[in-house]
Regions:
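Nucleotide-activated sugar donor-binding and catalytic core shared by glycosyltransferases
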Residues: 1-223
Length: 223
């Protein structure tokens, strides 16, 4: 997937999003896009029934928006890319630079931050994380995430991550180290990721990230 993005683009994925998440994400992106024109937003709505409304919300904001189902992966050179298909979240995580994990600005209780952490991504997450409270707190404590409450927090956090690659790498490595240190806690996540990734070899540019050893053992197809 990453090979289809323009090389100079920084990819921010907003994963498993709900309406309340997307309101803040899109407000933040409107500001960030002005400051960082090469920033691309990938949105993966949590529920299929929201694919259409999410896409319309992006277009109402004036963003050039492409859909996974309609545009495939050819020439992804857009403001927002909406993943309106199922079963591809982890591959898009693997192709991204920064992650926001949804259900955490919405009063949903959050979703699994480890799915982003395992791909060495710095994570933005909201305060409503009671479904994954312990591991989300550990991720914050180890320096692998920023806690955000609204669009303004997102803008501040993203500005710092975009401006400093060293900070991005350090946070991503901290997130990945948490995965390694809590293998018992993440066993089910690892099994799921291993199963999905074994279905499709990772391209070289993606595999160069820090992945668990079981993912590194997958056969690599050159791009």
């Amino acid at each position: 997937i990453r090979s289809h993005y323009p090389e100079n683009r920084l990819i921010w994925i907003a994963a498993s999003t709900h309406l309340e998440d997307e309101i803040e994400i899109l407000d933040a992106y409107a500001v960030l896009k002005q400051r960082h024109p090469d920033l691309m937003l990938v949105i993966v709505p949590r529920h299929p029934e929201r694919f259409q409304s999410t896409t319309q919300a992006c277009r109402n904001k004036g963003f050039q928006t492409q859909l996974r189902s309609e545009d495939g992966l050819s020439d992804i050179d857009t403001d927002v890319f909406v993943v309106d298909t199922m079963g591809e979240l982890l591959e898009f995580y693997a192709s991204s630079d920064i992650a926001f994990v949804g259900g955490s600005l919405a009063d949903i209780g959050g979703h699994n931050v480890l799915e982003a952490a395992v791909f060495s991504l710095p994570v933005l997450v909201g305060p409503n994380t009671h479904n994954f409270e312990e591991i989300t707190q550990l991720l914050n404590d180890c320096g692998g995430s920023f806690l955000v409450h609204d669009a303004n927090d997102i803008i501040r956090s993203m500005d710092s991550l975009i401006a400093d690659k060293v900070v991005r790498v350090r946070m991503g490595q901290s997130a990945y180290n948490l995965v390694k240190e809590h293998k018992g806690t993440v066993q089910m996540t690892m099994m799921m990721i291993d199963t999905i990734m074994n279905q499709k070899a990772l391209p070289v540019t993606i595999q160069q990230k820090n992945y668990p050893e079981k993912l590194k053992k997958n056969e690599v197809n050159p791009e």
